[in-house]
Regions:
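Helix-loop boundary and gating motifs at the non-cytosolic
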Residues: 1-50, 212-252
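Cytoplasmic helix-loop-helix junction between adjacent transmembrane helices
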Residues: 105-146
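Juxtamembrane intracellular "pre-TM" segments in multi-pass secondary transporters
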Residues: 1-3, 187-224, 239-240, 410-416
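C-terminal ends and interior cores of transmembrane alpha-helices
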Residues: 77-95, 286-303
Length: 416
């Protein structure tokens, strides 16, 4: 794949990511203001997450047969449709009708998100070259920049809601993304990532032990984040602390932007160490941080002290989570074969989406049952399971072939 096509794929992915982050904040804050319960708000996002599971499985297979450029264009188009559809929901509707309608529209957005993400991340494999160092750095830059832009999207969504209202914000995003779609569709050329061998449909579930184990770890890692992030923390900031739309959106935006920045610089932070050892060490560190935040909330400190403990603790959580996520994003490409990269990545991100679905549901349920404290204990348990799963990750193919595994003397290590 030439660099021009890669730039177009990445630009399309970035534009989509802005609308994706903004839409999440729009929906969450809008329906919280309408008086929907934490569980009802969680259900609004379940269609989005559930379709992500299916899309990653099937989308990777479709991408390998038709080319990643086509899956990207379809993803952008579906997001435009979802944004416009959401603008037709009326406040006068019964709550159950609104929940079902928004879930359905969000399901389209979930398909769109994972088609574009799978397309962009799989494309990295075809432009990075054979060196693991280049691959890791390009994955880190793409993933980090995506999350930074998603954070900007969070703030953008909150700002658009406060300034223009729900419907106008949706239409504005649909128009901008439509322009992006036209540019990408007319300028993108070739069949990016099209497999030379037509893999059968059953290949979407035929994975190596390494990919299965990494996917299981990814499931629990992302579920652990969304347990506190998706519903519990925003409602806590809005209802308990009384923050404004700008405050809630601003903090979540800053968190995701910082998280993305750390991901982009992950190769520098991690140094010259084995990816597998680093994944184990940083997941254990994340579990300890989660437990400390939960203990601080349970300690019945003053409101100001509790707020400082939660917010500062979650900032540290974000740094360590970003390192874990970046390591996983590198490992899936390192474990993948060139001719199966889109199906391997699709399977892996279907596990990611399944984790987000479970985390989203638990975020609403645990917050309803025990507030932010119980949500944080749920996070701790899921991160601990992630750590246990990383203990069984095998060496990457490059490491297995390496006659000199010492990272201090081998110049070909990924973290250089």
């Amino acid at each position: 794949m030439n660099l021009r096509n890669y730039v177009l794929v990445t630009a399309g992915y970035w534009a989509f990511t802005l609308t994706d982050g903004a839409l999440r904040m729009l929906v969450l804050l809008h329906f919280n203001e309408l008086g929907y319960s934490p569980v009802a708000i969680a259900f609004l996002f379940l269609g989005y997450e559930f379709m992500g599971i299916l899309t990653n499985l099937i989308g990777g297979w479709v991408g390998s047969r038709t080319g990643l450029n086509r899956t990207l264009i379809v993803g952008l188009g579906l997001q435009v449709v979802a944004l416009i559809a959401l603008s037709f929901q009326q406040q006068s509707w019964a709550e159950i009708g609104s929940v079902v309608f928004v879930m359905s529209a969000q399901a389209l957005s979930g398909i769109a998100k994972d088609l574009t993400k799978m397309s962009a991340k799989s494309a990295v494999k075809f432009v990075a070259g054979d060196g693991d160092g280049a691959l890791f750095k390009m994955v880190a830059i793409l993933t980090g920049s995506k999350n930074a832009l998603k954070g900007v999207g969070f703030f953008l969504g909150a700002a658009l809601l406060a300034a223009f209202g729900y419907d106008a914000a949706l239409w504005a995003m649909a128009i901008v993304l439509s322009v992006t779609l036209v540019v990408v569709a007319t300028m993108l050329t070739g069949d990016i990532g099209k497999s030379k061998v037509k893999a059968p449909l059953r290949s979407i579930l035929s994975k190596s032990d390494a990919i299965n184990r990494l996917s299981a770890a990814r499931f629990f890692l992302f579920a652990s984040r969304d347990i506190w992030f998706v519903v519990a923390l925003p409602i806590y900031l809005d209802d308990v602390l009384g923050w404004s739309f700008y405050g809630v959106g601003g903090f979540l935006a800053a968190w995701v932007i910082g998280y993305g920045a750390v991901q982009s610089m992950a190769p520098r932070f991690l140094g010259r160490h084995s990816e597998i050892v680093a994944a184990r060490n940083w997941s254990l560190t994340l579990a300890l941080i989660s437990a400390l935040i939960a203990i601080a909330v349970a300690a019945n400190l003053s409101r100001a002290a509790t707020t400082v403990a939660i917010l500062s603790g979650l900032v540290v959580f974000g740094v360590v989570f970003a390192l874990n996520s970046s390591l996983h994003s590198y490992l899936i490409l390192a474990y993948s074969d060139d001719d199966q990269v889109s199906t391997d990545v699709g399977f892996y991100y279907s596990a990611n989406a399944a984790g987000r679905l479970v985390g989203t549901l638990l975020s609403g349920v645990l917050y309803l049952w025990g507030g932010l404290e119980l949500a944080l204990w749920g996070t701790t348990m899921f991160v601990a399971i992630t750590w246990l799963l990383t203990l069984r990750l095998p060496a990457t193919p490059a490491m297995s072939r390496d006659p000199n595994p010492d990272p201090d003397t081998n110049p070909n290590r990924a973290f250089s």
